[in-house]
Amino acid sequence: MHHRTSARRLAVISTAGIGLALAQAAPAAPATSSIGRVLRVGASEPLRTPSAAAAVAHDGDTVEIAADTYPGDVAVWSANHLTLRGMNGMAHLAANGKSAQQKAIWVIRGNDTLVEHVELSGCRVPDRNGAGIRQEGRGLTVRHCSFHDNEDGILTGADPQSDILIEFSEFHHNGAGDGYSHNLYIGQVRSFTLQFCASHHAKTGHLVKSRAQSNFILYNRLMDEEDGASSYVIDLPNGGRSMIIGNIIQHGAHAENGVAISYAAEGAKNASQELQVVNNTYINERKASAVFLRVAGQNPTVRAINNLVVGSKSVLAGPGESSNNLVTDAPGFADAARHDFRLVAQSPARGAGIDPGKSGEFNLTPAFFYLDPLGSTPRAKGDKLNIGACPVSGK
């Protein structure tokens, strides 16, 4: 039987490192369960499209969508506690320029929604912010999904009791090209967790933008690659209690902005103004100068520790503490040309990290490495801590 766990609980489990919120098994054969029905979608099913399922879904239902392409199919999901899951592969919602309510491919109005194994692409709206998912309900978990060629990948509203967890998912080539639409845009919610994901090739906008009160951006691959032209890699415009740990961050040659991580640039409006930037690898390939971290606001608590900075001379612009960061043009990468940023045995970053301590009860020492594609590998206990986000090649 499939037991639902709230998005809030999943976020707590994942960010605390108690146990990963991994993909849950599909419900067993019976078409009903103690929490709701199982609605099956596909060419050979009574419900041929996801939108047909959305029209009849009740609270607690699980919608199993056969792996296939559903061109031009858009939907509003109003029921609470839904599971929306692609089966036996990815269910591709190829909007082809269409949208629900001139907002998104899927407008999710219900609370506590789980989305797995779904690909959403091609949303366009007159306001130029057509999203793969527009989250209007409270609480969303997204896992093993893909968002591409929309004007926004995911766009959420403001809800001070909403928690957003996104993991093992990919965002690319989203944006209207105007700088106001992004691969991923989280509104003023309680917490946002992004882990084991890849965000790349935003069309002028940011790879990750969040106004959440708390942000946990952990073990991701955030890159322009050869031909991307994003703005900020990570934008936290209102600050917030934010942990940025173990990410591979790259500014490409065509990046629009010279700042990788921007904090509180639109005003320190969130209750907490604490930023911990620990064990990230930053590669700047812009010809112009670049800054790894720019901080605004008065008297925020900011610590940048154990970061590996390549191609930029500036780690931190603005208030804060910078400790044990390695700025070098000779980092000892295994194969930088192929974006393999693991360390060779002779790298000056190998084993050169220091204990970053804790933020409250949150342990700042990285527990994982990002692993392509869209995965992770645990950091071996007892290994000396490197500087940067990557392990030694061959280990």
What would you call each of these model-derived segments?
Residues I13-A21:
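Bacterial N-terminal signal peptides
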Residues D59-A67, P71-A95, I108-D112, A349:
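Beta-solenoid repeat scaffold
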Residues A23-A26:
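N-terminal signal peptide c-region/cleavage motif recognized by signal peptidases
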Residues S34-T69, S347-P348, N386:
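Acidic Gly/Asp/Thr-rich repetitive segments characteristic of extracellular carbohydrate-active
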Residues H2-S14:
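Bacterial N-terminal signal peptides that target proteins for export
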Residues Q346-K395:
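Surface beta-loop-beta hairpin patches that serve as ligand-binding interfaces in beta-rich domains
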Residues D68-T69, N88-M90, R338, G353-G357, ...:
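Acidic glycine-/aspartate-rich tracts in secreted/extracellular proteins
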Residues G72-A75, H92-I108, E116, L120-R342, ...:
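Glycine- and acidic/polar-rich repeat regions and solenoidal domains
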